């Protein structure tokens, strides 16, 4: 057995080692050579891809504060998937970390539809693009847009055909903001499910959930579940506390209050991700069934000190805005007296709890969209609570198009629509790509 195993190991090595040596000895491609000659780019490494002929990850040197170069620099991660120098380029303005784009099977929708190169930019202060030391003062939307501007102007030395900016959720917001601040950097913008919030607790999401998503019967079923989980708090809170303890979660507020906020978050999470209503347990279900569903929809790490999104919470408090909770239907059963200003109290560390929301970004984007008509397509889901603060209010625009998928969630994409609508969107983008 040992001899057989040794032989198999040597046989595998005999095959793999020459392959690895051949790869190491392979001359650099034209793209590699041109990448190496670009300014501010370093640490270029090839990656495996099932969808693109060539794929690389590299870092680009960025200013922490473009208006004050003396503040220093950081390195931002970029993933480049290459189709051809004669093809258009899709710029993904990611709002978070870039980990998922490193997967060999990753392929962005627009890049696939239009056979385009793909430039995926990780957001500053996320993933491997975290400055050291971490100074939150430099985490601003404007600074992030200068990051994109530097990436785009640098890579346009390689790709001189049309550019499409796109992103999902916070990435979609970034696409919209980028077009506002640097309107000529790209030719087309396609933000997916992108909210434009006007305050820390915008105020449009709560009535949207209460009155507009799905049907009255389905909304009532979701609300009844929330009420039942609150009514059974004496039985379920110990299960909740053990669940959080086992996961290693800690919180800035008492566990009974965390429970309340998790219940309030339930309806937003349910509709955001399009969970089928028939998955909601009946109110006479046993405790275990209720609790299992509750945790499946609303993972409490969202409110914990271990939350994976501290950078986002800072931005929401400063510029991006967020949503509030309507406690009126549940007030009788809640430990908390009010949910107002919960992001500061629950989701920010004490040293950042005094952050003030600045409406400048919102006002600038609204003004830009009203006064201009860039080539943009907005994609939204009809049941997604973020659509409440989406850009669905523009009128009399020739170029800006808004598509809302009835019943759609935060996962809505072009491919989610019916065939006729998909063709309409693709035809419009193709026309823009082919315009001189």
Predicted regions mapped to residue ranges:
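Alpha/beta-hydrolase fold nucleophile elbow
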Residues: 159-169
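Short beta-strand/loop motif that positions the catalytic acidic residue
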Residues: 378-380
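Short glycine-enriched nucleophile-adjacent loop
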Residues: 172-183
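Catalytic-loop region of hydrolases
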Residues: 24-116, 420-422, 427-436
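Alpha/beta-hydrolase active-site loop
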Residues: 138-157
């Amino acid at each position: 057995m040992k001899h057989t195993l040794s032989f198999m190991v040597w046989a595998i090595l005999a095959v793999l080692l020459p392959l690895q040596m051949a790869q190491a000895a392979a001359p650099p491609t034209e793209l590699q050579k041109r990448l190496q000659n670009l300014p501010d780019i370093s640490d270029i490494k090839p990656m495996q891809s099932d969808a693109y002929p060539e794929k690389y990850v590299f870092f680009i040197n960025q200013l922490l504060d473009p208006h004050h170069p003396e503040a220093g620099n950081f390195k931002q991660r970029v993933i480049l998937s290459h189709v051809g120098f004669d093809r258009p380029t899709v710029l993904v303005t990611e709002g978070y970390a870039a980990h998922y784009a490193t997967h060999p099977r990753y392929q962005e929708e627009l890049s696939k539809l239009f056979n385009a190169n793909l430039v995926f930019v990780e957001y500053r202060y996320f993933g491997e693009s975290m400055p050291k030391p971490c100074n939150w003062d430099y985490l601003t939307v404007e600074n992030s847009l200068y990051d994109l501007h530097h990436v785009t102007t640098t890579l346009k030395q390689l790709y001189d055909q049309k550019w499409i900016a796109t992103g999902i959720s916070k990435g979609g917001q970034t696409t919209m903001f980028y077009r506002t601040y640097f309107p000529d950097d790209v030719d087309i913008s396609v933000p997916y499910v992108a909210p434009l919030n006007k305050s820390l607790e915008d105020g449009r999401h709560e009535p949207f959930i209460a009155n507009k998503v799905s049907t009255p019967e389905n909304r009532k079923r979701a609300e009844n579940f929330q009420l039942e989980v609150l009514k059974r708090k004496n039985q379920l809170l110990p299960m909740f506390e053990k669940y959080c303890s086992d996961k290693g979660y800690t919180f800035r507020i008492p566990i009974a209050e965390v429970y309340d906020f998790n219940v309030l978050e339930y309806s937003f999470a349910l509709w955001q991700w399009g969970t089928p209503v028939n998955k909601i347990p009946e109110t006479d279900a046993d405790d275990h069934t209720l609790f299992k569903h509750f945790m499946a929809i609303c993972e409490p790490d969202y409110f914990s000190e271990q939350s994976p999104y501290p950078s986002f919470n800072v931005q929401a408090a400063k510029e991006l805005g967020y949503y509030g909770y309507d406690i009126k239907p549940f007030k009788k059963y809640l430990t908390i007296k009010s949910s107002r200003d919960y992001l500061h109290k629950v989701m920010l560390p004490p040293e950042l709890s005094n952050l003030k929301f600045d409406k400048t970004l919102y006002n600038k984007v609204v003004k830009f969209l009203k006064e201009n008509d860039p080539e943009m397509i907005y994609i939204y889901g009809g049941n997604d609570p973020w659509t409440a603060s989406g850009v669905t209010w523009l009128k009399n625009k020739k170029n800006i198009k808004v598509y809302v998928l009835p019943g759609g969630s935060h996962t809505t994409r072009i491919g989610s629509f019916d065939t006729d609508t998909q063709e309409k969107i693709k035809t419009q983008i193709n026309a823009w790509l082919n315009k001189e």
